[in-house]
């Protein structure tokens, strides 16, 4: 009898701890008028440090304080070192070899593609995985160099440890009003500045004015093209790091927009 009572108490304690490890939270990023302000279930809300690591082009790894790993736009052969990575989530903004090399990523990640099979129609993504919320925003990329066509792609928002991180995707123009409504609040932008096929430095600066993030990390550019110098035009405080990663939390965000340039070597630079 005593054994039965003890077992019941152990079970109740276990269930209580399991319940406490989850929390209902309203999104800090999504516009409640768009999202319906519906709460989502996460593990106990964390607000610890988030690591953002850049491998080149549009390829990042975002790691939450609880260890959840997100990979964005893994590339194929582009002249960058090929990292050995594993992830819980992989996002693909467009179907191109520079962005969709999912096979590179180890583990059994959930793969989220901004476009449906065939790449002609946008998908609607809204996923909660452990302590991370992921949703996407439809964008357009310029098609061919004469801009005669426009290709579809997707930007992604990651809500991690209370931070709202936007991966811009291969966007070609500043956001329109509908896109801004879908995006919501942004703390950090991983921002394309490459020009030609995507938005260039001047257009990217307009996006900063639209979203007013605290941190902007430029991507999708080569150091030798002068694009970075045009982007760091003195409008915002900027710094160049001698590393390919930063660690940031809600409490360590700068008071005003800061451009942070991460360093990635190409194979020939090693």
Set out the residue ranges of the language-model regions:
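N-terminal secretory signal peptides that target proteins for export/translocation
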Residues: 1-6
């Amino acid at each position: 009898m005593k054994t039965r009572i003890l077992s019941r108490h152990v079970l109740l304690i276990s269930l209580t701890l399991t319940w406490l490890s989850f929390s209902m939270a309203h999104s800090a990023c999504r516009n409640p008028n768009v999202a319906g302000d519906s709460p989502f279930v996460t593990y106990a809300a964390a607000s610890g440090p988030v690591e953002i690591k850049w491998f080149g082009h549009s390829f990042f790894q975002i790691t939450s304080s609880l260890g959840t790993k997100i990979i964005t736009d893994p590339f194929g052969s582009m002249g960058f070192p090929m990292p050995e990575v594993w992830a819980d989530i992989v996002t693909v903004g467009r179907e191109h070899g520079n962005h969709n090399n999912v096979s590179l990523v180890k583990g059994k990640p959930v793969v989220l593609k901004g476009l449906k099979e065939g790449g002609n129609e946008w998908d609607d993504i809204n996923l909660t995985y452990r302590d991370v919320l992921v949703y996407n925003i439809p964008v357009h990329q310029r098609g061919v160099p004469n801009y005669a066509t426009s290709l579809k792609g997707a930007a992604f928002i990651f809500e991690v440890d209370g931070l709202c991180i936007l991966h811009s995707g291969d966007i070609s123009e500043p956001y329109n009003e509908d896109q801004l409504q879908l995006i919501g609040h942004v703390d950090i932008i991983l921002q394309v500045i490459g020009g030609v096929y995507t938005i260039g430095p001047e257009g990217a600066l307009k996006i900063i004015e639209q979203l007013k993030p605290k941190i902007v990390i430029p991507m999708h550019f080569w150091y030798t093209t002068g694009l970075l110098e045009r982007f760091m035009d003195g409008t915002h405080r900027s710094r160049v790091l001698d590393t390919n990663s930063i660690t940031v939390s809600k409490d360590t965000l700068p008071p005003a927009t800061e451009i942070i340039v991460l360093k990635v070597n190409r194979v020939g630079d090693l």
